[in-house]
Design a protein with these regions (language model features):
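Short, small-residue-biased leader/transition segments that mark boundaries at the very start
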Residues: 2-7
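Conserved ABC transporter NBD signature motif
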Residues: 24-32, 39-40
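Conserved ABC ATPase "signature" region
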Residues: 64, 68-91
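Conserved catalytic motifs of ABC-family nucleotide-binding domains
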Residues: 116
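Catalytic Walker B motif of ABC-type/P-loop ATPase nucleotide-binding domains
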Residues: 120-123
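ABC transporter nucleotide-binding domain
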Residues: 138-227
């Protein structure tokens, strides 16, 4: 929602030192924002949602400038390593105005890494990008995780959160309404859907009140919803066989993060 976007942006701006908080406490990597603001900012690398890079510098020059702003000495800079990590080493001396949109997004990630922060904030890194670029950015994010970097990812794309995150928080109307591991979050919905491809319509007299809800019953498809903790699918298969039904195929559908999100925000 728009309200959640505003609060999310304010939260990131507070961490970045752009906005002063009015109340509360912020602890980042053991540092209190009020007492140690510099240490907090050095502990973070923030990748903004908007693509905003100087078109007249090369990636290599931009990273060196960024490192200088954080006080990284020349002998301690890892510019080439970072460019290699985000697959931009072959473009290190090209003007940024000549880079594609995907390359510019990767360059923003590279800028956030110059001072070796333990935490990276990626603000909707794949917003508005095509499928191929999204997959490439996902691989970059996974590479950072393997290096031990803690990543805070903001996204409206729920599949992205489910695919990449170990823990997920959901903001609704400015409030954090859920925060848990991805596995626990997905387990918040206990129902599961089962779809049978069959050869004829099922007689429902024998099929009702068996611990599941019938969603579809046609000449070719029978679909049910059931509680995965309480119901054994062998029971339904046995009932179908008793009616002389030929099961051509079975497809199982687990709830995804979108189902969890809708359930939480509606309640």
């Amino acid at each position: 929602s728009a309200a959640s976007d505003v609060y999310k942006r304010q939260f990131i701006n507070i961490l970045a030192g752009v906005t002063d908080k009015t109340s509360g406490e912020v602890i980042v990597w053991g540092f209190d924002l009020d007492k140690n603001p510099r240490q907090v900012r050095v502990s973070l690398g923030i990748v903004p949602q908007e693509i905003n890079v100087d078109p007249f510098f090369t990636p290599k020059k931009l990273l060196d400038l960024q490192a200088g702003l954080f006080g990284v000495k020349k002998k301690d800079r890892i510019t080439d390593t970072i460019l290699d990590l985000v697959a931009l080493k072959d473009k290190s001396n090209s003007y940024t105005r000549n880079l594609s949109g995907g390359m510019k997004r990767r360059l923003l990630i590279a800028k956030a890494l110059v001072h070796k922060p333990p935490i990276i904030i990626l603000d909707e890194p794949t917003a508005g990008v095509d499928v191929e670029l999204r997959k490439n950015l996902w691989e970059n994010i996974r590479s950072l995780r393997k290096l031990g970097v803690t990543i805070i990812l903001t996204t409206h794309y729920l599949q992205e959160a489910e695919e990449l995150c170990d823990r997920i928080g959901i903001i609704h109307k400015g409030n954090l309404i859920a925060l848990d591991t991805t596995e626990n979050m997905l387990n918040k919905i206990q129902t599961k859907t089962l779809k049978f491809e069959i050869n004829k319509r099922i007689v429902l007299d024998d099929m009702e009140n068996k611990g599941y809800n019938i969603l579809t019953n046609t000449d070719s498809e029978f679909k049910i919803e059931y509680n995965k903790q309480e119901f054994n699918i062998q029971k339904i298969i046995k009932l179908l066989e008793n009616q002389g039904i030929v099961i051509k195929d079975i497809k199982s559908e687990d709830p995804d993060l979108e189902d969890v999100f809708v359930n939480l925000t509606n309640n």
